Amino acid sequence: MKVLVVYYSMYGHIHRMAEAIVEGAKEVVGAEVVLRRVPETLSHDVLEKMGAVEAQRSMSHIPICTVDELAEADAVIFGSPTRFGNMCGQMRQFLDATGGLWVKGSLIGKVGSVFASSNTQHGGQESTILSFHTTLLHHGMVIVGLPYAFQGQMRNDEITGGSPYGASTVAGTQGERQPTENELAAARYQGKHVASIAYKLVMAR
């Protein structure tokens, strides 16, 4: 049973969440978990002006995902920063290249899940996750979120990401805030939850 975690991260916040997702998914016996990035669409000059070159370099060891890898997985967990309440352009471009998979029905019945980040607590994390769902449903995927069984969603003693739609993190207006232990715990829970459901679906075939 194969779980693919595919993400885009500009400054490393989603990358750290993706690592936690992988950690959680690996807790499921028999799960093969693969971590991938989507291709960058911004030029080096633009990334340099945005102060993102160093962070991009630190993630360069993660292989770039191909659309065919989606078809090889039993579950796909997508990660994206928020861009005006939607997924980032890099992820949108990647998903727009999956038309061939749609024609073949290659993703029908596979588990799909999403995690996200935003600069502020109410900066569009939930709508960003929901922006994926239309595409995943068109592909016939089975959407899985982050259930309230994860008690960290009920915390009100700190600013924290996370909702029934999926794990998320608040990055700060300057990207100065790193994912908290509660946010990472949510990501680990989601990874394990998705892998567990995918395992049950595979075994039921």
UniProtKB/Swiss-Prot annotation:
Keywords: Flavoprotein, FMN, NAD, NADP, Nucleotide-binding, Oxidoreductase. The keyword NAD applies. This is NAD(P)H dehydrogenase (quinone). NCBIfam families: flav_wrbA (TIGR01755), PRK03767.1 (NF002999). InterPro entries: Flavodoxin/NO_synth, Flavoprotein-like_sf, Flavoprotein_WrbA-like, FMN_Rdtase-like_dom, NQO. GO terms for molecular function: flavin adenine dinucleotide binding; FMN binding; NAD binding; NADH:ubiquinone reductase (non-electrogenic) activity; NADP binding; NADPH dehydrogenase (quinone) activity. Substrate binds at residue 102. NAD(+) binds at residue 11. Pfam families: FMN_red. It catalyses: a quinone + NADH + H(+) = a quinol + NAD(+); a quinone + NADPH + H(+) = a quinol + NADP(+). Coiled coil: none annotated. The keyword Nucleus does not apply. Binds 1 FMN per monomer.
